[in-house]
Structures are given as structure tokens and as C-alpha cells.
Amino acid sequence: MSKEKFERLKPHVNVGTIGHVDHGKTTLTAAICTVLAKVYGGDAKDFASIDNAPEERERGITISTSHVEYDTPARHYAHVDCPGHADYVKNMITGAAQMDGGILVVAATDGPMPQTREHILLGRQVGIPYIIVFMNKCDMVDDEELLELVEMEVRELLSEYDFPGDDCPVIMGSALGALNGEAQWEEKIIELAEALDNYIPEPERAIDLPFILPIEDVFSIQGRGTVVTGRVEQGIVRIGEEVAIIGIKETTTTTCTGVEMFRKLLDEGRAGENVGVLLRGTKRDDVERGQVLAKPGSITPHTTFESEIYVLSKDEGGRHTPFFKGYRPQFYFRTTDVTGTIELPEGVEMVMPGDNIQMKVTLIAPIAMDEGLRFAIREGGRTVGAGVVAKIFE
């Protein structure tokens, strides 16, 4: 069977459903696929095939995730849905499925529940930029005032975690009704699709962002100088441009005098490419793995930050015992390990394998970072946790 060519004619946006258990995330995912396929064309997916989510491994962590795709006239969407709460936590923290926007599903019959709050908080911590609310099961609520009350509660909850609660679109619908082909509820799915198109801006492509290349290796080439190699994370580097070397040591700037790929000389290196960059007047010992090459001024080195962490369970190959304050593991950023100390939240004495928690981390050497950067927690090369930078202190 030949693979059909993927036509990238429309902008591509990543979204996903979040919210409390049994509020209808998977049913909504199936309803979106079904209704949009019916109205705009495409493949419908049924509930069972989405609910039966395959297991994936991301940085050694087992996560069950379903990926579906659907189209509106304006865009192509990739949508992730997770069967269990733990899968959401892991997914958001590892960034296994990056979201440009989230669809928060809240059952009108229950209103916001503990996981509703937890998913909103996680969304804030891991940098999901936009949230659209789908109030589900509205066909089971007769009281108009009750619906308004739930909407108000959800908006207040979003505002509490720094989302624009007053401005987030709220769509009142019934995923099951739409899945069963009831016209009034199908219309609400179309309304949700329009909200996705209008409320979530088109994500910036990696190539349009400022240049960053995490350094993997450093070579000295006789008569030509020092070459650093790695995969361009974002942006473009061109010959003759100034680049900064950031992290671990004092930041320095130099000039890119050459770019090569597979021994061919290029004018530029672009996001996603594995390249070697030749640096003017830089000595072999001035640069090391773990630093990044970046557009000067675009990213800064830091040592102290607030993070959201998932600790691997014993079954996932993580620790067998809890850890306490004063724990000093290595934090693996991009290409290297840096030792750091942790500070647990007030009232938390210990952290068990399988937990997720916020903690303040202080590294012994600075690393080039922005909020939203993912890292692994390791002990002697073995991964015991995953985390994301939520807020930078210094």
C-alpha cells in the first residue's frame, strides 16, 4: 500500500482535550472527527479506536495517547487525547504532545472538579498558551441558570491561573448528542471548530524563531578553526552572522564563518538540520557540549527556576524509594547533565515515585533556558524523572 502524499497546504495546529475524568474528553474527540468529516470531508474516527490509545515511550516514560487529525476549511489539526489522568500529567510535563491550544472539557452536570483545576494549573505551568472551554452534557441540564453558574465557575478558575477567563470562548454542547447525529449538537461542534480557528493564533514555525543550536560536539579543524555540531532547534544561522555561545561559562560572542552538512558547504543552517558551524577565533577549549549557539540576546543563561516535575514510578524504571529535601540529582538539558539541588513546596516532606510536584531547582552551572524548556532528571545516567521550566528566578 503506497502512502499518500501529505499535502501541507493549510497551516498545521496542535491541540488536545484536557479535563476531569468522565467529563467526555474522548467522546468529544470522536464527535469532532465525525462531525467535521461529515461537513468538511476527511476520515471519521469512532470512540473505541480513540479510547484504545496505544502506549508510547517518551524519555523512558510510558504514556498512552491517541492522536487524531481533522480539518476545518482554514486549517489542519492534530489532536491528542489521553485515556487516563496520569497520562495527561506525563504528556504535558514531557511535552510528548505539544499543544498550541487546549480544549478544556467540563461536564455541565458536575461543574469544575479536582482534575479540571489540576489540568488548568498544569496547562499554565507547561505553557499551553490558549484554552477553549467545551461545556459537555448540556442536554442533561434543563436549568439555564445552572449552565450560567457552571460557566462562571470555569471562567473564574481559568482567571485564577492567569488565563484570560473572561475572554476564553465557552461552547455549550453535547458530545454524545453530536456523535449520535443530532443536528442542534452537531452545530455546537462546528462552533467549537470555528473557535479553534479564530481563537488559537497560527503557531510560529520553528524556522521563524530566533536561532538556537544545542552543541553536541566540538572539533578543531587544522587551519580552519573550531567547528561545533548539533541539530538546529529553531531559526536559521547564516555565514557572517554574529552568534552567542551561552551556558555553563561566561557568555561569549563570535562569528559564524561556515556552515556544513554531510561535508557539503552551505550558506545557512535551518531548523531541523544537523549541521556543523565554523566559529571565528574560537578555541577548542572555549566551547563544550551542553552550551548553545544562539542569536545574541535571544536567550539567557539561568541557574534557579520553578519547575513542574513527574517522578518515574518503579515500574517505569524509576526510583524504588522516595526522595527528600537536599536531593541532588543531575538535570539533563538538551545535551548535557548539570547537578542541581531542589527545594520542595511548603508542607511537602518527601516525593514518591509516580508523583508529580512543583519544585524550585538551583543548578551549579547556568544553562540557556526559557520558560517551557523540558529536561530529564537523572541519577548517574539513569532517568528518574521529567520536568519543565515553569518560571525563571535568576
UniProtKB/Swiss-Prot annotation:
CDD domains: EF_Tu (cd01884), EFTU_II (cd03697), EFTU_III (cd03707). Disulfide bonds: none annotated. Residues 136-139 are annotated as: G4. It is an enzyme of class 3 (hydrolase). It catalyses: GTP + H2O = GDP + phosphate + H(+). Its EC number is 3.6.5.3. GTP hydrolase that promotes the GTP-dependent binding of aminoacyl-tRNA to the A-site of ribosomes during protein biosynthesis. This is Elongation factor Tu 2. It comes from Photobacterium profundum (strain SS9). The lineage of its organism: Bacteria, Pseudomonadati, Pseudomonadota, Gammaproteobacteria, Vibrionales.
